[in-house]
UniProtKB/Swiss-Prot annotation:
Catalysis performed (reactions): an S-(2-hydroxyacyl)glutathione + H2O = a 2-hydroxy carboxylate + glutathione + H(+)
Protein family (similarity comment): Belongs to the metallo-beta-lactamase superfamily. Glyoxalase II family.
Example of a GO biological process term: methylglyoxal catabolic process to D-lactate via S-lactoyl-glutathione
Cell membrane listed as a keyword: no
Biased composition (Basic and acidic residues): 229-239
Class in the EC hierarchy, top level: hydrolase
Species this chain originates from: Pseudomonas syringae pv. syringae (strain B728a)
Name this polypeptide is given: Hydroxyacylglutathione hydrolase
GO molecular function, one term: metal ion binding
Binding site for Zn(2+) 2: 60-61, 133, 171
Assembly and oligomerization: Monomer.
Length: 259
């Protein structure tokens, strides 16, 4: 049985730790800081860190890799197209690997960075997606390297995953993302309900993750670029007629950058 824990890091990062109760092994995703992981291992001395999964090269996702590799000799898996510290296995689109007995498939999702990947575990009841900084709860990552078209295509690819997919993104941005979503779709009842719920959770110091794909399709404006109300708001903000969904996305992303 696998349990998934969020290890907070920095101001708003989450390092995801997968704990295999049967083998007493564990894996982590995007350890930007080694300390939270080493602290967990110290509190759970029977467990051994076997794998480190990396979605992209930004330091808040890889800053702890070298120290963890030195301390644990864990296998480091990351995107082939980016420079990843201590990487053992370079991954490209559609690669498959087994971690803690779970098979994951790699999805290339350029946009936030050009080599960004996501890890997807297909399961009949509970599919898992570790999306890094591509798909957030109610939002998406900034475009540091890629184009709006690339990010729109990447999000569209992820949106085709099953509605039941649990989404483990790397930051606690949900509240600010939902405030933006409400500005885009003020009449969207699902967004209003989710905003109220997440506001309550955060006031209780609870995390807002994981999300799920069905919820994202109802409340994430960056997955709703085909909705008439979203296009109209994007047109209004950009003072132009956005003639494609990727153009709507570009308008929304530019607005969010200044929101």
């Amino acid at each position: 049985m696998i349990q998934i824990h969020a290890l907070p890091a920095f101001n708003d990062n989450y390092i995801w730790l997968l704990q295999d109760l049967s083998s007493q092994q564990c894996a982590v995703v995007d350890p930007g800081d080694a300390k939270p992981v080493l602290g967990w291992l110290a509190q759970n001395p029977d467990y051994r860190l076997t794998d480190i999964l990396i979605t992209h090269h930004h330091n808040d996702h890889v800053g702890g890799v070298a120290e963890l590799k030195q301390s644990t000799a864990a296998r480091v898996l990351g995107p082939a197209a980016e420079t990843i510290p201590a990487r053992d296995i370079a991954l490209v689109d559609n690669d498959r690997m087994t971690v803690l007995g779970l098979e994951f498939v790699v999805h290339a999702v350029p946009g936030h960075t050009l080599g960004h990947i996501a890890f997807y575990h297909e399961d009949a009841t509970t599919p898992l997606l570790f999306s890094g900084d591509t798909l957030f709860a109610a939002g998406c990552g900034r475009l540091f390297e890629g184009t709006p078209q690339q990010m729109h295509d990447s999000l569209g690819r992820l949106a085709k995953l099953p509605d039941s997919t649990l989404i483990y993104c790397a930051h606690e941005y949900t509240l600010s993302n939902l405030r933006f979503a409400q500005a885009v779709e003020p009449a969207n009842v699902d967004i209003a309900e989710r905003l109220a719920e997440v506001t309550r959770w955060r006031s209780e110091n609870r995390i807002s993750l994981p999300s799920n794909m069905a919820l994202e399709k109802r409340t994430n404006p960056f997955l709703r670029t085909g909705e008439t109300s979203v296009k109209e708001k994007a047109d209004e903000r950009s003072d132009a007629q956005n003639t494609s969904q990727s153009a709507v996305f570009a308008s929304l992303r530019a607005w969010k950058d200044k929101f």
